[in-house]
Structure formats: structure tokens, C-alpha cells
């Protein structure tokens, strides 16, 4: 592993128990999402969705490779807690790239969790910064802190006109989609304002946790301008998948095991159209991770 970049604050104050607890939650979030079944167009325990190049075992290997980096993201966020938030990303990016390299080694070149490395790296660094600043580690604070790390990111990386546009730049210029960068820079509003309250409300009503998570995935698909979907199916594919998810929610969503048949059918339709809502899956990982934060906070005396 590469050394953590030199920074301005001693991060040794973070107890190892806290580092391990937050990192374990982030790792479990990745596993919880991929094992959740059935999911429309996504890899799960039943099939590989619209993907021909990856399987469930790839995601398990990938999550294991990423796990070792999660405490380092937290430590980095703590170690630069006195730096301006705008300066954090430039030091965090090399750690993320090294983590990506480990992911690709573990999966023989398959991109399983690149989006999650970006989001979980930001959120873990935000947790480290908040801890070092003695600020409450809440979902809202974590996401707003991550947003400050990403200030100006969309402008810098999506609006520039390169001779050879990246996929993200092309989708931004053609469809106005900002993808993972835009969601992070805005402080994860789809999660904080919609998915997380929805998931918590379903759990409070006594909904089975897996069914609640599947219902929350539908909510995210219905609202998210998912660049993974748009890159495969264009504006038409994105509109279709959003409408399908919205229709299922209006019909009552995923309330009981009998409703899983609707998801099986949705999955087959996505496979036929070669659509995979990977961006929404990444946001579901964020949602589950943030929903569990209170489990750790008692160790932090919150």
C-alpha cells in the first residue's frame, strides 16, 4: 500500500475501534447491496443482470480488496482536518486511485466498485475530519462535509471541452447529467432528502429490511439521473427505467415477498434492454452505510 500523504494534523487520536467500526460498516454496505436480490439489471445472488463481464464473486473479491483502504480514507480525513476543505480532494485522489488498482487486481480488470470507492472514500474522509474537529458524526454532517471536498468538481471535470470527451463529459454535455460528481458536490441530496428517510420510515413501520432496501432502490432508480443507464440506453433508456420504477412504487412498491415477482420481471426487462442502474446501486450503498452510523456513534460518545 502507498503511504498516506503528509498532512497537518496528528490522526492518531482516532481509536482503532472506531476506525474498524466505520470501515466494517462501509465494507458491509458493499456486500449488502450486491447480495440484495432480485435487483433490476444488476448483479445479485440470482444472476449477473445486464452484465456479461462480472459476477457475484467478483464483487465479493472487490469489496475485500477495498476493505483495507477504508480506515486509510478515515485517517486521511482526520490528518488534514485543519486544511481548507477545498484542498482535501487532491490528497484523497491518490489514495482512491491506489484503492482502484487493488480492486482491478482482485477482479482481473473488472470495474465492480469504482463508484463506491469514490463515494465511500469521500464519506470516510468526511468522518475522519468530523471526528478530529469534534463535530457530530451524523449522515447530514458527513454528506455536507463531503460536499465541501468536491466544491467546483463538476465545473472542473465535466464542463471542460477536451478533444476526446470522457463518458462523463459526453453525458453531461448531451443530457446534462452530472453523475456521481454532481451528487457528491451537492451533498448527496437523493440520499439525505429521499432514500435515507424512505428506508428509515419503512423499517419503523416494521418492513422486512431486505424488502425495505429493495423498495428504496426503486425510489433511487425513479429519481436518479443514472449515468450508467444513460451510457447504455441514452435518454430513452433512462426515461424508461425511471418510469418503470415509478410505476412499481405507485402500485405499492415491495411490501411482501409476493411483490418480488415484479422485480424479477423488471430485471428481465432491464437485461433485454441491456440497462444496469449502477449509479443507483452506488447510492443504495451510501444509504445503507449512513443508516447504520448510529450503531458506531455510541463508541464516540454521541
UniProtKB/Swiss-Prot annotation:
Q: Which GO terms describe its molecular function?
A: ATP binding; triphosphoribosyl-dephospho-CoA synthase activity
Biological process, per Gene Ontology? prosthetic group biosynthetic process
Q: Name one Pfam family in it.
A: CitG
Keyword annotations: ATP-binding, Nucleotide-binding, Transferase
Q: What is its EC number?
A: 2.4.2.52
Q: What chemistry does it catalyse, as a reaction equation?
A: 3'-dephospho-CoA + ATP = 2'-(5''-triphospho-alpha-D-ribosyl)-3'-dephospho-CoA + adenine
Gene3D superfamilies, alphabetized: Triphosphoribosyl-dephospho-CoA protein
Domain of life assignment? Bacteria
Cystine pairs: none
Q: Identify which top EC class this enzyme belongs to.
A: transferase
Q: Which InterPro entries match?
A: CitG, TriPribosyl-deP-CoA_syn_CitG
Keyword Transferase annotated: yes
The entry assigns this protein to a family as follows: Belongs to the CitG/MdcB family.
Q: What is this protein called?
A: Probable 2-(5''-triphosphoribosyl)-3'-dephosphocoenzyme-A synthase
Species: Citrobacter koseri (strain ATCC BAA-895 / CDC 4225-83 / SGSC4696)
Gene expressing this chain: citG
Amino acid at each position: 500500500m502507498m503511504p498516506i500523504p503528509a498532512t497537518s494534523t496528528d490522526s492518531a487520536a482516532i481509536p482503532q475501534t472506531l476506525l474498524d467500526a466505520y470501515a466494517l460498516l462501509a465494507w458491509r454496505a458493499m456486500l449488502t447491496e450486491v447480495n440484495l436480490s432480485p435487483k433490476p439489471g444488476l448483479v445479485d445472488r440470482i444472476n449477473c443482470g445486464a452484465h456479461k463481464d462480472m459476477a457475484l464473486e467478483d464483487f465479493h473479491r472487490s469489496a475485500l480488496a477495498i476493505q483495507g483502504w477504508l480506515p486509510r480514507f478515515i485517517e486521511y480525513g482526520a490528518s488534514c482536518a485543519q486544511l481548507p476543505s477545498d484542498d482535501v480532494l487532491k490528497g484523497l485522489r491518490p489514495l482512491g486511485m491506489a484503492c482502484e488498482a487493488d480492486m482491478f487486481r482482485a477482479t482481473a480488470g473488472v470495474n465492480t466498485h469504482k463508484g463506491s470507492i469514490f463515494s465511500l472514500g469521500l464519506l470516510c474522509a468526511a468522518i475522519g475530519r468530523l471526528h478530529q474537529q469534534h463535530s457530530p458524526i451524523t449522515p447530514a454532517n458527513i454528506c455536507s462535509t463531503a460536499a465541501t471536498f468536491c466544491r467546483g468538481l463538476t465545473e472542473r471535470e465535466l464542463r471542460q471541452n477536451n478533444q476526446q470527451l470522457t463518458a462523463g463529459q459526453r453525458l453531461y454535455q448531451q443530457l446534462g447529467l452530472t453523475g456521481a460528481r454532481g451528487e457528491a458536490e451537492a451533498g448527496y441530496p437523493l440520499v439525505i432528502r429521499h432514500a435515507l428517510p424512505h428506508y428509515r420510515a419503512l423499517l419503523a413501520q416494521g418492513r422486512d429490511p431486505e424488502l425495505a432496501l429493495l423498495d428504496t432502490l426503486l425510489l433511487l432508480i425513479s429519481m436518479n439521473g443514472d449515468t450508467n443507464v444513460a451510457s447504455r440506453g441514452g435518454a430513452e433508456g433512462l426515461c424508461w427505467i425511471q418510469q418503470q420504477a415509478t410505476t412499481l412504487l405507485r402500485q405499492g412498491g415491495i411490501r411482501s415477498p409476493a411483490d418480488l415477482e415484479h422485480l424479477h420481471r423488471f430485471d428481465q426487462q432491464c437485461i433485454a434492454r441491456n440497462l444496469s442502474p449502477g449509479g443507483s446501486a452506488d447510492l443504495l450503498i451510501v444509504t445503507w452505510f449512513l443508516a447504520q452510523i448510529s450503531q458506531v456513534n455510541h463508541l464516540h460518545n454521541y
